[in-house]
Amino acid sequence: MEYFNVGKIVNTQGLQGEMRVLSVSDFAEERFKKGSQLALFDDKDQFVQEVTIVSHRKQKNFDIIKFKDMYHINAIEKYKGYTLKVSKANQGDLQEGEFYYHQIIGMPVYEKDRLIGYVKEILQPGANDVWVVKRQGKRDLLLPYIPPVVLNVDVPNKCVDVELMEGLDDED
């Protein structure tokens, strides 16, 4: 079965079985909602078990979650450092124009017909996502995911078209 990363358990939260998760999910509110099915993977990326979310809330930059049948710190402490993943079957359907991060990472990024680089990772610093574009012989480019910059994301043909606004590329 194919799985995709949605977060990393970085610590426990209190004594009642809550965990602090650093999300890397494109749809965190959907992914961590009550009833969601996720999988735990250990630090060697080995499947451990399926889990069900029973509660979720945001606190600062973290998602605080609790699993079904794990209601005390002693039951969850061993999961610190583990990765949460969603199976392909549990990803859910997308609306037109939406996509998953794993579909974008690795895509080539073009301005007109000039290859700029490849999407290396996607950051979530605040109001909009920022795509990190790895370029050959240059520093990584931080590309805000906003309409004037990202013109088209063609998932089937695996390419991203952009228009770099003045000041975005400090190496040109």
UniProtKB/Swiss-Prot annotation:
SUPFAM superfamilies given in the database record: PRC-barrel domain (SSF50346), Translation proteins (SSF50447)
Iron-sulfur among keywords: no
Function according to Swiss-Prot or TrEMBL: An accessory protein needed during the final step in the assembly of 30S ribosomal subunit, possibly for assembly of the head region. Essential for efficient processing of 16S rRNA. May be needed both before and after RbfA during the maturation of 16S rRNA. It has affinity for free ribosomal 30S subunits but not for 70S ribosomes.
A GO molecular-function descriptor: ribosome binding
Keywords: Chaperone, Cytoplasm, Ribosome biogenesis, rRNA processing
Keyword Transmembrane: no
Gene Ontology biological process terms, A to Z: ribosomal small subunit biogenesis; rRNA processing
Subunit organization: Binds ribosomal protein uS19.
Protein name: Ribosome maturation factor RimM
Organism: Streptococcus pyogenes serotype M49 (strain NZ131)
Family according to the record: Belongs to the RimM family.
GO cellular component terms attached to this protein's record: cytoplasm; ribosome
Compartment list: Cytoplasm
Positions of the PRC barrel domain: 95-168
Domain notes: The PRC barrel domain binds ribosomal protein uS19.
